[in-house]
Amino acid sequence: MWAAATANGGKLNLMQMKNIGLLKTNPTNDYTTDSAGAGTALATGQKTRNRRIGTDSLGNKIQNITEALAAKGVQTGIISNDGITGATPSAYYAHQPERDMGQEIAEDLLTSPADLVIAAPVEAFAANDSLLTKQLREKNIAVCNQLPQLSQVPLNQRVICLQGDDYGKNFRVIEESFNTVITRLSAGKKGFFTMIEGAKVDKGGHANDLYTVVDEYLSFDRLVGKALE
């Protein structure tokens, strides 16, 4: 955060927020969390072991906020510039004991009540006619691979959009999708919830790539500015 603030003249939209919260996401088996354990803690309110997705330390499924709110008629969205089976987005729809179980995690989309999921494609969706794509469409869940295609999907139909960033076109999926996300989820009568992740801040940190950390953080901060409007 401070690197991005320094690069941006000391200003961030995040710093304009009047209320912030603190969640301790350390796992049950270590002092330091990973994205799976932290994502599960954020999505469910319950700590677990590292590497687990939506399951407790014993491997039992834990209800996530997407499921809890959907049961009350609230519209829900999961948005990320990571792959759709990345640890953080999957914690909001999947229940698997190991974060590397990509195929099994992707298949949990078949039973997730999430109304809108936008994230980068992964191997499970390698072909437009993949088995998982066919199974989703059989459940009347639309699957598309470009944001503009969302306008063709009825507002009351669940949809998964498999699109990631395209830096060659200066296309950042979480920024470009924001207005569409709000429009679709606002169609419900009981409010909405959406989790939006800027995953590449972390990826830049792992690579010790300061430019990526700052660039991605400022991208996410622009999104925060839109949300505060």
Model-derived features: where do they sit?
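N-terminal catalytic scaffold of extracellular/periplasmic and nuclease hydrolases
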Residues: 1-125, 132-150
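Gly-rich Lys/Arg/Thr-decorated short loops/hinges at beta-loop-alpha junctions or inter-strand turns
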Residues: 45-49, 155-168, 202-207
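Generic hydrophobic alpha-helical segments
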Residues: 65-66, 105, 177-182, 224
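Short helix/loop capping segments that flank catalytic or ligand/cofactor-binding pockets
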Residues: 87-88, 126-128, 171, 204
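Active-site His/acidic residue clusters
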Residues: 87-92, 165, 181, 189-228
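Phosphate/oxyanion-binding active-site loops and adjacent basic polyanion-contact surfaces
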Residues: 98, 170-178, 216-220
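Active-site-proximal structural scaffolding
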Residues: 129, 155, 174, 217-220, ...
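Active-site regions of oxyanion-processing enzymes, predominantly non-cytosolic
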Residues: 144-146, 150-162, 177-199
